[in-house]
Amino acid sequence: MNALAGFSIWAQRNRWIWAAIGVLLLWLVLSVVTNRFSLSSLSGVILSASFLTVVGIGQMFVVTTGRGNIDLSVASVITLSAFVALLTVKGQDANLAIGVVAAILLGLAVGALNSLLVVGLGIPAIIATLATGYVLATATLLSNKALPGFAVSPALKELATGRISGVPIMAIIAVIGVTASSLVLRRTVFGQLLSAVGQNRAAARLAGIRNGPVIASAFIISSVLASLDGLLLGAYIGGAFLEMGQPYLLQSIAAVVLGGTLIFGGSATALGTLFASILLILIVTTMQIVGLPPGAQDIVQGIVVIFVLALAGRQALARRASADLADAGKNPTERTDVQAVQARPK
């Protein structure tokens, strides 16, 4: 019983473990039920999950800012970035630097726009980023008309599909991104500010923290990573098409929350985002093996997202209630005064 209690306490601090356990269990089930799973097939799953991890890390920073903030423009950013890469790189390695700069500038512009809408104008993040996504969708249609053909830079193609000693290069990029994000969250001032703002904006403001720049930085990080992800994803599939980023909208949110990042903000885990991305790709792979049609697959993924969000919401409310009780216990006089005021006849 003591060991179980100790593991429970440890798991609360390392919430990524549940996604990791889910990956292990689902992989074992698939290996037993089918004879088609091996280390090579796992490598393919990890490759697909790497693209989701990159955009999921950016989504994680936005969710960490609290108040239910999510970035719904990532799907449109991914798609538009793939088209911009084709238009700027034109299949030549000599133009690769121009394509990378264009992707970064696109991410910075979209992130700045989202920040202006959310921080400057006070529009809820869901509405603001959804509106931005519609604007980007129009720009994507215009880019599609201007696209002369599909030609991918060989160097970019190698980066997106190549392997080093059997390990996908994209997986290495994803691990580097997860490691860097973990260091930012745990070892830097920005990570501490981000957690403080996500936990309690009023308290952070009283502590002298400028909430606006911190929240704006999170949206910019999300857009830049989504744009770079679109650049690599376009090279991976060998072109670009409308709605190519759409699957990453719900999946990026699910990967963040399923990985252990609190939906109400204040605490994030980049490692959990990585494991949850692998788990979600395994779920999709399982549905494809079963033979579910695409529509049914979307329904199952939607149910998974709803279940995870509902569970995360209940856990957050439970933590908040426990914190309120703890605060009341620490300040019995204040609690009595509040109760007296509420009981006073009007």
Question: Which residues fall in each region the model found?
Answer:
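Membrane-interfacial amphipathic/re-entrant helices at transmembrane-helix boundaries
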Residues: 1-56, 92-98, 344-346
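Cytosolic-side transmembrane-helix boundaries in multi-pass membrane proteins
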Residues: 1-26, 179, 206, 210-213, ...
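Short loop segments and helix-boundary regions at transmembrane helix junctions
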Residues: 5-10, 65-69, 108-151, 184-189, ...
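Single transmembrane alpha-helix segments in multi-pass membrane proteins
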Residues: 28-30, 34, 39-91, 121, ...
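Hydrophobic alpha-helical segments embedded in the membrane of multi-pass proteins
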Residues: 49-60, 76-80, 108-112, 175-176, ...
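Helix-loop-helix "hairpin" substructures at the membrane interface of multi-pass membrane proteins
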Residues: 94-103, 109-114, 165-241, 252
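Transmembrane helix-bundle core of multi-pass membrane transporters
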Residues: 121, 125-187, 214-217, 236-245, ...
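Transmembrane alpha-helical segments in multi-pass inner-membrane proteins
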Residues: 226, 236-302
